[in-house]
């Protein structure tokens, strides 16, 4: 955990958590993407919030919009430990037509602009704007120091990604000093990096500003009728052209599982990437280390008993290999391999799960076989259901991606009759 320096103490983190994340399909039918469960007991938003707290930042605002109830309830239960008497604060900021009776949040920049008065009440010297829907560990204090040292108007967090995956990101080009010379939001043909034509330098959706400067920029943007009021589409391209925009490499501030580990950052914006990021945690030495007490991922800890494995008969042995099983689960004569089972689930006798991510309070009946599957919260899998062995049948009954990952929700089960 980072030491609480004066720069962290004088910074406010502002988390943008209003997006749906439609590429996660039915997983976001009832909840915003930042509220989606991850890693057995956490939510996606816990990573950005934990990074802020671990970096020494004690003033946080979270802007919410799309189907925010689940997200707000989670934060009220798990993130209520800040002390106002120490100038700490945690504000949940739903879209509430604060500027206009007809205007909700119309873009990422507008989601900050509409709450300038609340931000001003904390009197932060610096602002760090964060996306609430990525999985990573990062020491924001290092990025803040770079911003101050370079005297930048804005510092943009960036990461190298395969060029073919960069169409969904802001893509930048930088000079030898790290100054951003061009910024394209979600280009159809992303430019490669010098000497690495197959790699693009993508924005992480993390921006550092001096607060007074940010206020001026947002007020000008709000008055521009041609703006879409978006950081990636409007604010950053303008500052690249007319100001000083500096790139901060994620590799410089990533909190790694070991000195030789890769810098782990995942967008988890699709069902395939979400499934893979969860199963990454089942590796013997995962690149993203949830067991690191020096940089913990804070969350709401439900009161639950330890996980329990029962029966040791031939063909009916409760066991798990290369798997994570959260508290409150009972694995009763079932076999799990390379799977992640969230809080409060039941897996009944003779069932077999491989490469399966099960969200909280699901119930897997006897003799089910699930392979390469995501099971939504509270789903009741019927006895003998087989998923992941017949692609054509899976596609008819459930949501199946081109890579063969199946999503199962309760309405899909109900339609089976």
Swiss-Prot record:
State where alpha-D-glucose 1-phosphate binds: 105, 170, 185-186, 203
Q: Which GO terms describe its biological process?
A: glycogen biosynthetic process
Q: Which reaction does it catalyse?
A: alpha-D-glucose 1-phosphate + ATP + H(+) = ADP-alpha-D-glucose + diphosphate
Q: Which organism is it from?
A: Granulibacter bethesdensis (strain ATCC BAA-1260 / CGDNIH1)
Looking at the record's lineage, which domain of life comes first? Bacteria
Keyword set includes Iron-sulfur: no
Which InterPro entries does its entry note? ADP-Glc_PPase, ADP_Glu_pyroP_CS, GlgC_bac, GlmU/GlgC-like_hexapep, NTP_transferase_dom, Nucleotide-diphossugar_trans, Trimer_LpxA-like_sf
Q: Give the record's keywords alphabetically.
A: ATP-binding, Carbohydrate metabolism, Glycogen biosynthesis, Glycogen metabolism, Nucleotide-binding, Nucleotidyltransferase, Transferase
HAMAP family, alphabetized: GlgC (MF_00624)
Function recorded in the entry: Involved in the biosynthesis of ADP-glucose, a building block required for the elongation reactions to produce glycogen. Catalyzes the reaction between ATP and alpha-D-glucose 1-phosphate (G1P) to produce pyrophosphate and ADP-Glc.
Q: How does it assemble?
A: Homotetramer.
Query: What CDD domains does the annotation carry?
Result: ADP_Glucose_PP, LbH_G1P_AT_C
Please provide, alphabetically and separated by semicolons, the GO molecular function terms listed in this UniProt record: ATP binding; glucose-1-phosphate adenylyltransferase activity
The family note in this entry says: Belongs to the bacterial/plant glucose-1-phosphate adenylyltransferase family.
Protein name as it appears in the record: Glucose-1-phosphate adenylyltransferase
By its UniProt entry, which PROSITE patterns does this protein fall under? Answer: ADP_GLC_PYROPHOSPH_1 (PS00808), ADP_GLC_PYROPHOSPH_2 (PS00809), ADP_GLC_PYROPHOSPH_3 (PS00810)
Here the disulfide bonds are none
């Amino acid at each position: 955990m980072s030491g609480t320096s004066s720069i962290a103490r004088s910074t406010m983190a502002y988390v943008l958590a209003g997006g749906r994340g439609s590429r996660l399909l039915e997983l976001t039918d009832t909840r915003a993407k930042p509220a989606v469960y991850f890693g057995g007991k956490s939510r996606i938003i816990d990573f950005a919030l934990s990074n802020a707290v671990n970096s020494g930042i004690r003033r946080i605002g979270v802007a919410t919009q799309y189907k925010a109830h689940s997200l707000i309830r989670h934060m009220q239960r798990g993130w209520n430990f800040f002390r106002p008497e120490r100038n700490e604060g945690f504000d949940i900021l739903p879209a509430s037509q604060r500027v206009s009776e007809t205007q909700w949040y119309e873009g990422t920049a507008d989601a900050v602009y509409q709450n300038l008065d609340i931000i001003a009440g904390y009197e932060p010297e610096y602002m760090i704007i964060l996306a609430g829907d990525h999985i990573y560990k990062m020491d924001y204090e290092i990025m803040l120091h770079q911003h101050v040292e370079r005297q930048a108007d804005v510092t943009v967090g960036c990461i190298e990604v395969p060029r073919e995956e960069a169409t969904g990101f802001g893509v930048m080009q930088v000079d030898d000093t790290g100054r951003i010379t061009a910024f394209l939001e979600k280009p159809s043909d992303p430019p490669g990096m010098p000497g690495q034509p197959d790699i693009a330098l993508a924005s992480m959706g993390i921006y550092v500003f001096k607060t007074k400067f940010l206020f001026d920029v947002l007020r000008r943007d709000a008055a521009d009728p041609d703006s879409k009021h978006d950081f990636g589409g409007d604010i950053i391209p303008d500052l690249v052209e007319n100001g000083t925009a500096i790139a901060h490499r994620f590799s410089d501030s990533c909190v790694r599982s070991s000195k030789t580990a890769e810098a782990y950052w995942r967008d988890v914006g699709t069902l395939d990437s979400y499934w893979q990021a969860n199963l990454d945690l089942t590796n013997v030495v995962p690149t993203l280390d949830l067991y690191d007490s020096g940089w913990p991922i804070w969350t709401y800890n439900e009161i639950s008993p330890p996980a329990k494995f029962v029966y040791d008969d031939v063909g009916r042995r409760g066991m798990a290999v290369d798997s994570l099983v959260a508290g409150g689960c009972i694995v009763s004569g079932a076999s799990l391999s390379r799977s992640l089972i969230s809080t409060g689930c039941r897996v009944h006798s003779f069932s077999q799960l491989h490469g399966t991510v099960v969200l909280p309070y699901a119930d897997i009946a006897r003799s089910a076989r699930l392979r390469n599957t995501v099971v939504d919260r509270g789903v009741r899998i019927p006895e003998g259901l087989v998923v992941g062995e017949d692609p054509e049948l899976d596609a008819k009954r459930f949501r199946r991606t081109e890579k063969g990952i199946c999503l199962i929700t309760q309405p899909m089960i109900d339609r089976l009759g």
